[in-house]
Amino acid sequence: MPGDMQETMMFKVEKEEKVRVRDVLTEVQAALTEKGYDPINQLIGYLLSGDPAYITSHKGARNLIRRVERDEILAELLKSYLA
């Protein structure tokens, strides 16, 4: 037992892979459409309020969209629109 205290243990935190906003929006749109929601209206509700309840949990869409900050989504949409 005393020998166990002499060794340094390593702890690794896995980095969360960077997700592309475009990929997130595409997957969320598909999930919302499959459940019969209007993806534009639901995404607007989410972006304005920050309430993830606007996004269905179908296919993990709600968890997926929470991996991206709302300002990142808006920036990507503006870049795409203004380009």
From Swiss-Prot:
Highest rank taxon of the organism: Bacteria
InterPro entries: IreB
Pfam families on file: IreB
Family the entry assigns: Belongs to the UPF0297 family.
Name listed for the protein in its UniProt record: UPF0297 protein Moth_1643
Protein's organism: Moorella thermoacetica (strain ATCC 39073 / JCM 9320)
